[in-house]
Amino acid sequence: MAAVLLLFAAAFVYGHGMDAEAASRYTIYVNRKTNIVNVVDAKSGKVVRAMYCSTGRNYSTIRGTYTTVSKMRWHALYGGVYGQYCMRIHGPYLFHSVPYYRTSKNQLETKEYNKLGTQASDGCIRLAVVDAKWLYDNCGVGTKVVIGDTRKLQKPDRKKLKISTASRTGWDPTDPDPANPYYPKLKLKKSASTKLAYGSKASKKFLKKLIKVTSRTTSTADLLENVKVRGKVDTAKPGKYKVTY
């Protein structure tokens, strides 16, 4: 029987963003009690992103309706620490990442990261890096922000992660920087070089079984759910095919 040899090119995409030109469509809702943030499409009313946050201790985060006024890639915060992907809401109140001791990605305050989902800040709204970056990239200056305690917000699909506090510093596990030690790693299994018989099935589900994705924070099964397979294998036509993950 004829056979097909598969050649693979692997590229793992970590996280995703939306068109920044659509930023003006969004309204950001914050619940100080549940410490959840929802980004809602102002036209459709649909939640496009849900996130855990840390608002101010003892409800010290301001309430009301505001519009964002500026953005800063890194910015000094109260207490001599720094935040990534900062967006000013009003006065000293910002959206930003969990604080860092220095403007270096491996200097995150690990204990503070584990407080996401609870009141922990001095008034600003803290987010995981992947979420702070999403707001920074997709919500332009002038985006409406509504902060309160009673609006029921959708919970995030992503589970809250806990990181080791054995060291007072470290990386945010959600930071999409490829240098992040938490960054998912994708490898092809030995079976990826096997030949497929003429006329056999080569579904995307089957092709996913040829790779192994690992992360220090997420199970392989959960990671595979987010892996996209591009390319088509026609086992009725002998030849070489390229499949991208």
Q: Where in this protein do the model-derived segments appear?
A:
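Extracytoplasmic/secreted proteins, especially bacterial periplasmic and envelope-associated proteins
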Residues: K46-V48, R63, T67, Y82, ...
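Cell wall/extracellular polymer interaction/catalysis modules
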Residues: H16-M72, Q84-Y85, S167-T169
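Solvent-exposed, low-complexity, repeat-rich "mucin-like" stalks and linkers
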Residues: Y182-T220
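Serine/threonine-rich, repeat-prone extracellular segments and beta-strand-based repeat modules
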Residues: T217-Y245
